Amino acid sequence: MTEKLVIRKLGNAEKARVPEAQKLRDATTYNPVVPAKQFGFIHNNMDCIGCRACEIACKDKNGLAPGPRFRRVMYIEGGSFPDVFAYKVNMSCNHCAEPACLPACPTGAIWKRKDNGVVDIDSTLCIGCRRCEATCPFGAPQYDPSDNLVKKCNMCIDELEAGRKPYCVSAC
């Protein structure tokens, strides 16, 4: 589907904002935003007990329906007796230096904050085409069929701006 066909799904107010958002998307694709400081998550696997409180806190904070999970705790097991292994992997958006999802968005809804490097989605510009979901190697953008939008971790940006920790971190 071409960008023009995709953009037809937006309302008039959102359509008016698309050219500027696309211009920003194109500029940051070829000249990535270098934030003043880059926020990210560091997960200490030794401290994690696999309780998934971080997942629940994230779903509560973001009002997510069953299905999408911005924070995911997965278990990796393998080997054969007596040489077995098991560990937990805690995944969310990596807020990449050069996010693959950003140039994939036809409306420019995905953007990277200059002050802290958090990659975010403007839900008023998202049309739910799922291109970002297909390009992210980490599975961060996730489609929410209840809104027909793609959503992802934004590090609880409202909490960070208020001087607090993201919900997943506080719940751990």
Predicted features and spans:
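Non-ligating segments of multi-cofactor redox enzymes
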Residues: 1-171
